[in-house]
């Protein structure tokens, strides 16, 4: 469900940027079209889906680098005193809670690490390639995020990124591009950013469908979800992932998604990390191609940060908590009402 929320958020962002160019097209319609279209590409075959993802990775990194270089090469349009604090500081506890909630909201941006672990069984030489993928991927994502946020601050001061109703500007890339380069080039960047979100859907939908396929293969979901077509695509899993994403797109707002998905991903990742500790204790002799160094210190530190971010969200955003609890409740209903009825022992080779 964390991946489903990520798909809905990315699709909603695509729809938000499309609204900038075509205001008469509702966000939900554009987002739904993107999800269905990308799902159809992956349903055709594995080769087509992989080609879309490979092109998407190259295009996204290239566009971000161009935007960063051109942005810093342009004269700053931010109001004076970019980093000044106009409002009085809240109590230390309140500031810590707000900061933790902000971190939770951005957690899904690093979901690539989770994606690598999800498909670890399909990777050649996982003991080497998974480490390289995670370290290199996290380093690149972190660097790009720092630089792109630097460009945003170069384009506008923080208070200029807030709308009259107190909410942040959703299409921040379009806003920054117009401030730095003018309306015409800003529109061009808006179209390119739309393409970035569209291509990002490809990876999220592929990973999500593979998770469903893997669970069905182990007997944790109905067996029909493990069906592959002639070209190796898990069609039924793709359709289910598409349907769940469409439900979220039409039942929630983009702001609610961005505040909730990161927290949900943080929670589910925390549960997975806790599971690693339990598994190491219960099955110490299990073959592990990839081992955590300095165990159990890294998992404990991670779980501590997870608890802090979860507490921060609960203390600052009641609406987000309600949505998260609703999604978790739905997941439990599906698991105990459907999945467990189809579970079967894993066959040993």
Where are these regions (language model features)?
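Alpha-helical transmembrane segments of multipass membrane proteins
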Residues: 17, 36-43, 68, 149-151, ...
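Hydrophobic alpha-helical segments and their helix-loop junctions in multi-pass secondary transporters
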Residues: 58-87, 150-158, 269, 274-286, ...
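C-terminal membrane-solvent junction of multi-pass transporters and transport-like membrane proteins
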Residues: 224-235, 269-320
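Helix-loop-helix connectors at the membrane interface of multi-pass transporters/channels
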Residues: 11-30, 63, 120-127, 132-140, ...
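Hydrophobic transmembrane alpha-helices that form the core helical bundles
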Residues: 1-43, 48, 189-214, 250-267
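A generic transmembrane alpha-helix motif of multi-pass inner-membrane proteins
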Residues: 259-264, 294-349
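Membrane-interface loop-to-helix entry segments
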Residues: 27-80, 111, 134-138, 261-271, ...
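TM-loop-TM module centered on a large, flexible mid-protein loop between adjacent transmembrane helices
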Residues: 16, 20, 89, 103, ...
